[in-house]
Amino acid sequence: MTAMSPLQYQKQLRLNEARRLMLSEGLDASAAGYRVGYESPSQFSREYSRQFGAPPVRDLARLRMSL
């Protein structure tokens, strides 16, 4: 069981998949967001920032530096 609603869980899965796509396939934020079902790049960026604590570009730069 999780403390998340089904909608929150689905959103978390989509954002994690978008993050994986950006890291492993080199997609930009707009393309990754679109691939996981976001139609609006600004909505994707807003929800990504809430989930990971930074916008996609800054989060990915930080992750790549730590590899």
List PLM regions with ranges.
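DNA/chromatin major-groove-contacting recognition/catalytic segments
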Residues: 58
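Terminal helix-turn-helix DNA-binding modules in bacterial transcription factors
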Residues: 1-39, 61-67
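Short, charged low-complexity intrinsically disordered segments located at boundaries
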Residues: 27, 49-50
